[in-house]
Design a protein with these regions (language model features):
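Secretory targeting and sorting signals
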Residues: 1-31
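Boundary/entry segment of secreted carbohydrate-active catalytic domains
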Residues: 32-75
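Conserved, mostly hydrophobic/aromatic
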Residues: 100, 152, 163, 189, ...
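Aromatic/acidic polysaccharide-binding cleft in carbohydrate-active enzymes
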Residues: 278-348, 357-362
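C-terminal beta-strand-rich structural cap/linker in extracellular carbohydrate-active enzymes
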Residues: 401-420
Length: 420
C-alpha cells in the first residue's frame, strides 16, 4: 500500500468509524445453508463482477472484464452535482456514464446520497469524512430530495440502470438520519424512479455489517419502517467488510447475519447484492491494525469473495476498488495485480456457466456447466486438504495456468478448476 486517495470517501469514513466501533463476533466456518436467494440452476451473469473505478468520471477504466460499476467516490454525489439549489454540474456524472458505456458496461448503479450544504439539516454532520460538510445530514426539505432524484433519473433514463438512495446509512459518518427518515427517503426515491424509468432497479442503502452496534441499532428498525411503506426496494444490499484481521470466512458470517436479519423481519425475498467489499481495512479498535494482503492470498481471497457470494445467494459484488494503490484497503486491484489476474481467470471459468451447487464446509466443492461441459472448482476455507482427482484430466489455477492431472490426489487450498 502506497498512495492514499483524497477522493476515497467511503473507506476513510469506515476506517474512522472502525477505530471506535465494536466488531460483530466472528464464527467458525459453517456448512452451507439454504440462502434467502438460491442461485442453483441459474446462469452466472457478467454483472456478478461489479467494480468501483477510481477516476471513472475522468475516463479511467479497468483492464480486466467488468460486468457492472457502482458510482461512488467518482465526484457524483448529490452535493457534487447540485452545487446550489437548481444549479447542476453534470460533467463528472456524464463522464462516468460515458466511460462505462464506451467500455461495454451498460449496467450502472448510482448512489444518490450526499446532501448538499445548502439542503442539509445538519451542516456539522460528518459529511463523508469531512470532505463534503453536511453531506451526512438529512434534507431540511424532502422536496429537495424529490427534485434531485427526478432530475437524475430523467436525464439518465435507460443509461443508469440502478439507483441506491444512500451509502452505509447505519454509520453516522454517512447519515445522521433516523431509520424512519431513511425509509422515507427510500420510498420517495422508489416512487419517483419507477414513475420516470420503470425499468430501473432500486437498491436498498448499502448497510455496513462489521460494526455490531450500528448494524443492530439501525438495520432491523430500518426494515420495520420500510415494511410499513410497502417494501419499496427491488434489491437488498450490504457491505460485508470483515474486521481487518478477518478472512473470507468471517465475511461470510457477516453476510449470513445480514441475510438472517431480513428473515427475522419478515422481509420479502429479493435479490441480494454486496455493493462494496475488500479486506484488511483497519479496525475496529487498536487490536485490528490494517493489513496488506498480497500475492497468492490476495488472489485467493478476491476469487473466494465472488465464489462465496454465489454460495450465499448474493448475485452481485462490487469490489472496492480499481485504481492506484490505496493505503486503506488490504487487497489492491489494478493491472497485473494478483487479485486482478484471479478475477479475470474466475470470470473465464464461470461467466455464462450454469451453477449446479456447492458442497462442503471446510473443503468446498462447487460445480458448473458451461458449453455442455462440467467443471469443478475446489478450495479450502483454511489450511490445505487432499482432493481425489479420479476422472479429471486438467487442473487450472487462478493465475490462468493449466496442466494435466497426474496422480490420484492433489492438495488444494486456493481455488482451482478441474475438468474432465
Amino acid at each position: 500500500m502506497r498512495l492514499p486517495r483524497p477522493a476515497a470517501l467511503s473507506l476513510v469514513a469506515v476506517a474512522v468509524a472502525a477505530l471506535t466501533g465494536s466488531v460483530i463476533a466472528s464464527a467458525p466456518a459453517q456448512a452451507a445453508r439454504v440462502p434467502m436467494q438460491d442461485l442453483t440452476g441459474t446462469t452466472i451473469q457478467p454483472t456478478l463482477f461489479g467494480m468501483h473505478v477510481f477516476n471513472l468520471q475522468n475516463g479511467v477504466f479497468p483492464t480486466i472484464p467488468v460486468g457492472s460499476v457502482r458510482l461512488w467516490d467518482t465526484e457524483t454525489t448529490w452535493s457534487s452535482v447540485e452545487t446550489a439549489q437548481d444549479q447542476f454540474s453534470w460533467t463528472k456524472l456524464d463522464g462516468a456514464v460515458a466511460t462505462a458505456n464506451a467500455n461495454g458496461v451498460k449496467d450502472i448503479l448510482m448512489v444518490l446520497a450526499g446532501t448538499p450544504s445548502w439542503a442539509t439539516d445538519d451542516p456539522a454532520a460528518g459529511g463523508l469524512a469531512g470532505v463534503l460538510p453536511g453531506a451526512a445530514g438529512m434534507p431540511k426539505d424532502f422536496a429537495d430530495w424529490d427534485d434531485w432524484v427526478r432530475q437524475v433519473v430523467t436525464r439518465y433514463k435507460g443509461r443508469i440502470t440502478a439507483y441506491q438512495p444512500w451509502n452505509e446509512a447505519n454509520l453516522t459518518t454517512f447519515s445522521t438520519g433516523t431509520p424512519a427518515e431513511m425509509a422515507e427517503l427510500t420510498k420517495r426515491a422508489y416512487d419517483i424512479i419507477k414513475s420516470v424509468d420503470p425499468a430501473a432497479t432500486v437498491v436498498a442503502p448499502g448497510t455496513g455489517t462489521r460494526l455490531g452496534g450500528p448494524f443492530k441499532k439501525f438495520y432491523p428498525a430500518y426494515l420495520k419502517e420500510l415494511g410499513a411503506r410497502g417494501w419499496p426496494v427491488d434489491v437488498w444490499a450490504a457491505h460485508t467488510y470483515p474486521a481487518s484481521l478477518g478472512t473470507p470466512v468471517e465475511r461470510a458470517v457477516l453476510a449470513r447475519l445480514w441475510i438472517d436479519t431480513h428473515k427475522a423481519a419478515g422481509a420479502p425475498d429479493k435479490p441480494l447484492w454486496d455493493t462494496e467489499n475488500n479486506f484488511g481495512l483497519a479496525g475496529p479498535g487498536p487490536t485490528n491494525p490494517d493489513q496488506d494482503i498480497v500475492g497468492t492470498k490476495a488472489a485467493d481471497w478476491a476469487a473466494r469473495t465472488y465464489l462465496d457470494a454465489i454460495r450465499l445467494g448474493i448475485s452481485r459484488v462490487y469490489w472496492y476498488s480499481w485504481g492506484p494503490e490505496l493505503d486503506l484497503v488490504g487487497i489492491q486491484m489494478n493491472t497485473g495485480s494478483p487479485a486482478a489476474v484471479a478475477l479475470t481467470t474466475l470470470q473465464d471459468w464461470i461467466v455464462g456457466a450454469t451453477y449446479n451447487g456447492c458442497t462442503g464446509a471446510v473443503k468446498v466443492t462447487c460445480t458448473f456447466t458451461k458449453g455442455g461441459k462440467k467443471s469443478t472448482i475446489v478450495w479450502t476455507e483454511r489450511g490445505a486438504a487432499p482432493f481425489k482427482t479420479k476422472g479429471f484430466t486438467k487442473i487450472c489455477a487462478l493465475d490462468g495456468t493449466c496442466k494435466p492431472v497426474t496422480g490420484k490426489k492433489i492438495r488444494v487450498s486456493s481455488p482451482v478448476q478441474l475438468t474432465r
